[in-house]
Amino acid sequence: MEIRQFRFHVGLPREVRLLHTTDNHLCLADERDGARKIALAKNRAEAFGASADVLCERFRASVAYAKENRLLYLSTGDILDFVSLANLEFARQTLEGCDYLMAAGNHEYSLYVGEAWEDEAYKQQSFVLVQSYFKPNLVFDARIVGGVNFVTLDNVYYNFTAYQLMRMKEEAKKGFPIILCVHTPFYAPKLYDFMMETDGSCAYLTAAPEEKIACYNAHRYRQQKADAATLAFVDFAAHEPSVCGIIAGHCHHPFADTLSWYRKVPMLVGGAGCSGCAAEIIID
């Protein structure tokens, strides 16, 4: 496992330490899930250049590291590659006894990966099942640890909601420094340029400006164009002084950038857990 180091400075009297992983992409299926998902599991594992067993072991190793080193464990989503009972059961069993936070990823709700337009209606086909296997609230959750308010929330389809903004305002009133934990990173100029150079078709970021997404194809433009509720959430976060940092995933490449909001806000994007990446984060 390749573990990088990252530090957020928020003015704490004592350090808070955690292990961040993201995009583990478990690819398990058995007879309960059916022949189609068994075939999907094999094909998807091969797409990540590993066997299903190797992907499982990389996830298990990250959780074991957090337990052994008494670190809070943070996942910013895509623990699963697709919805299956085998994936859900392995994830729950592996996380048993681990102190963890979680922001869901888009693959947490993916039934067959790429077979349909994914939106809120699509998500609701599997949301209740998926939520039942994880302790944190996957829509919006918040937990204060060592004087830091870790806010974990769903932006898996590049959007935020009015409900999440309402909850965010409530958390801001508590007066603790906030670390926002999401699956899809916020737009930041250097990250945008890096992702466009790496992928070539789009940057896979939340709330990228119109002029930055105009070059996307029709599917990606529709998928990643920010709606009014998303822009309202980002505007609040940008102006809220308690927001001190952002931790995200989704891009499969480790990257650190700074959001040039009304103040500088650091953002860490984790490397892919399916490739054995993790980050030990110190908040002081």
Language model features: what each stretch is:
Residues 33-50, 119-127, 196-224:
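Charged, glycine/proline-rich intrinsically disordered loops and linkers
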Residues 1-87:
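N-terminal active-site segment of His-dependent metallophosphoesterases
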Residues 59-72, 149, 158-258:
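His/acidic metal-ligating clusters that form di-metal
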Residues 26, 80-81, 108, 149, ...:
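Short active-site segment of divalent metal-dependent hydrolases/proteases
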Residues 6-10, 84-179, 197, 202-207, ...:
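Extended active-site neighborhood of metal-dependent phosphoesterases/phosphodiesterases
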